[in-house]
C-alpha cells in the first residue's frame, strides 16, 4: 500500500540593501551679504566679496532611488560637493548692465566656463567615505538642516558700462550656494548635479553691492534717425546721409563704439558693416567715416567729442524695388 505525503513548498524572499542605489540632496543656504564699493568711475572695476557662512539650509532639490532612512545597522558611502552658482551679469534699477568678472576664486574649482549666464564654483570632499550613521538620507524639498562647513571667500570685479549715469547705486545680486550630499550603496559612486539643473536652483542668497559712480560718459541722444529723404529709384544708389551726436566724458577714457545689426542685409559687403532696409536695399553704415562698424575714441581729459554715424544706400538693379525703406542697428559703448 502506497502512502502519499504532501509536499511542503517554501518560497523564501530575503530583503536587504543588495541593489545599487543613489540618493542626492541639495541644501541651499540663505546668506545675505552687503559690500560697499565706495566712489568709482567707469574706467575702474570695483570689487566685492562673497562669504560662505554656515547656518540653516533648506532642501531645494533631491533625486533618490534608495532608502530614506539609515538605522545604523548597515554601511553606505557618501560624498559631498559645495556649490556656488553666480550670475555673470546683473541689471541696475535704471536698466544698465553690470558685467561680473572673477578676481580671486581661492581654492574653488571653476567649471563649465563656457556658460554664457553663470559661473560655477565647486569644491568636493568626503569622497567614498564609509558610514554607518543613522539618519535621513533623502530629505524632501522644504526640510532643513544645519550646515557647519566653512569655505573660502570668492572675490569678484564689476565692469561698469561706459554710459552708466552718475549717482548712487544699490544692486541686489541673487545667487545659489549650498551643499550637494550624495549617499550611495557602493564604493566609487560619483554624481554631480547637471549644470543646467544647477542654474535653475533657487537663488536664495543675496549680495547687496553699493557704490557711487562719480565719473562716466554720456551720449547726447539715446537714438538717432538718419533720413535719406524722397529719392528716385534711379538715383538712390550710393546716396549718403548722416547724423552726429556728442559724447561727454567726466574722466579720461578709451571708448570703443561698435554697431550691432538689427535687420539682416540683402547682400554681402565683405568687412563693411551693413543693415537691410527692405525692397532689395541695404545701408552701409560708418562710424566717424570707418565702415567696418566700429571705432575707438580717446579722451585724454574730461570733455566732449562728436561721433558721426553715416548711411550709404546700396542696391543691385535686379533686386531693387521702390518703397519705404527701414532698418536699424544698435550702437554699443564699450570700455576696454
From Swiss-Prot:
Any one Pfam family here would be: PapG_N
| Location within or outside the cell | Secreted; Fimbrium
Which SUPFAM superfamilies does the protein's record reference?
Bacterial adhesins (SSF49401)
Identify the GO cellular component terms for this protein. extracellular region; pilus
Membrane: present as a keyword of the record? no
Which cysteines bridge via disulfide bonds? 64-138, 217-249
Q: Where D-galactose is bound, by residue?
A: 79, 124-127
Stretch forming the signal peptide: 1-20
GO terms for molecular function, please?
A: carbohydrate binding
Q: Which UniProt keywords apply?
A: Disulfide bond, Fimbrium, Secreted, Signal
Classify the source by domain of life.
Bacteria
One GO BP on record is:
cell adhesion
The protein's predominant localisation is secreted
User: Zinc-finger: is it a keyword of this entry?
Assistant: no
> What additional remark is attached to this entry?
Strains of E.coli that cause infection of the human urinary tract produce pap-pili (P pili) which are hair-like appendages consisting of about 1000 helically arranged subunits of the protein PapA. These pili mediate binding to digalactoside-containing glycolipids present on the epithelial cells which line the urinary tract.
Q: Write out the function statement from the record.
A: Tip adhesin component of type P pili that plays a critical role in kidney infection through targeted interaction with the globoseries glycolipids containing the Gal-alpha(1-4)-Gal disaccharide present on uroepithelial cells. In turn, transcriptionally regulates host gene expression in kidney cells, leading to inflammatory pathway activation and renal tissue damage. Acts thereby as key determinant of invasive uropathogenic E.coli (UPEC), which cause pyelonephritis and urinary-source bacteremia.
Family statement: Belongs to the adhesin PapG family.
Q: What is this protein called?
A: Fimbrial adhesin PapGII
Organism per entry: Escherichia coli O6:H1 (strain CFT073 / ATCC 700928 / UPEC)
Q: Write the lineage as a comma-separated list.
A: Bacteria, Pseudomonadati, Pseudomonadota, Gammaproteobacteria, Enterobacterales
